[in-house]
Amino acid sequence: MAIELEDLGLSPDVADVMQRLARVGAGIARIISRNGLERDLGAGVGTNAGGDGQKALDVIADDAFRAALEGSAVAYYASEEQDEVVTLGEGSLALAIDPLDGSSNIDVNVSIGTIFSIFPAAAGPEASFLRPGTEQIAGGYIIYGPQCALVCSFGQGVQHWVLDLDAGIFRRMPDIRPLPAETSEFAINASNYRHWPQPIRAFVDDLVAGAEGPRGKNFNMRWIASLVAETHRILMRGGVFLYPGDERKGYERGRLRHVYECAPIAFLIANVGGRATDGCADILTALPDRLHARTPFVFGCASKVARVAAYHDLACEETSALFGSRGLFRS
């Protein structure tokens, strides 16, 4: 046994897949803890299907998860590191995975992770993943940080496990609490401010204005450049995360992948009372048009995400002309 799954009512097939994912996750945690002692896990080794640079650990993780799922109920394996869906067998499930999220942080000892989602297998490989996120059986992640933790939702709340290093087992912890309605943290890469669309600039301007601004309170900005780490913080204490599309070439639809990253995170957030959108429309009801499709991504406390959508509902010229520096909304 690699993870405690009692009392969750999972089907034998899903439970077996979770055991396999947990076993590989524990192994990757051990490999990461020895980075540099035997090999450089952050060494560049090529590019993936999306054109992003691959690190050695990206490939190690992808190979390990794919091998572990052979002989399981997973018929189709879709990975951010693979050009196409890999057919593993005749099973009833399909699994999408970002084997190693945040790999730019490998060499600086910052939390990285694995993001995954499980769907019922459809009639064909791509059809199993080009579907609404509401059809997920499970969505979750493993975070490799000071603790190695696994967080997953099966559609009823969000469950949380921590790796017991001595026993090699993910121990069940209390479930994640519903997200708070109001918090004072937001996460965005502010260095790209000049490239953002006007609604995102206006939203962030109002937060940065603090107690003297239209929101009437001070906010703190966070940015880790690891989606798993950002998600874990928001699940633990609330807030909102923004990765908008912008005017740079290749960034028009943001950089995060709908299938491998955004859909499973959106599933988690929805199951603690939060919301996830592309800035306007809900991620979970959107249909990706290809495996490696990218999307702008805003998620976290429902009220904050709704506020971002409200900024988008106003025309950019109206935003500038009517509100200027006093902001769009009063708190």
UniProtKB/Swiss-Prot annotation:
Main localization, broad class: cytoplasm
Reaction catalyzed: beta-D-fructose 1,6-bisphosphate + H2O = beta-D-fructose 6-phosphate + phosphate
InterPro entries according to UniProt: FBPase_C_dom, FBPase_class-1, FBPase_N, FBPtase, Fructose_bisphosphatase_AS
One Pfam family matching this protein: FBPase_C
Domain of life according to the entry: Bacteria
GO MF annotation: an example: fructose 1,6-bisphosphate 1-phosphatase activity
Location(s) in or outside the cell: Cytoplasm
Disulfide pattern: none
Pathway of action: Carbohydrate biosynthesis; Calvin cycle
Keywords: Calvin cycle, Carbohydrate metabolism, Cytoplasm, Hydrolase, Magnesium, Metal-binding
Binding residues annotated for Mg(2+) 1, in chain numbering: E80, D98, L100
Cofactor(s) of this protein: Mg(2+)
GO cellular component: cytosol
Matching Gene3D superfamilies: 3.40.190.80, Fructose-1,6-Bisphosphatase, subunit A, domain 1 (3.30.540.10)
Binding site for substrate: D101, G102, S103, S104, N189
GO term, biological process aspect, one: fructose metabolic process
Cofactor binding, note field: Binds 2 magnesium ions per subunit.
EC number annotated for this UniProt entry: 3.1.3.11
Residues annotated for Mg(2+) 2 binding in this entry: D98, D101, E261
Record text on subunit structure and interactions: Homotetramer.
Similarity-based family: Belongs to the FBPase class 1 family.
Protein name: Fructose-1,6-bisphosphatase class 1 2
Lineage, uppermost ranks: Bacteria, Pseudomonadati, Pseudomonadota, Alphaproteobacteria, Rhodobacterales
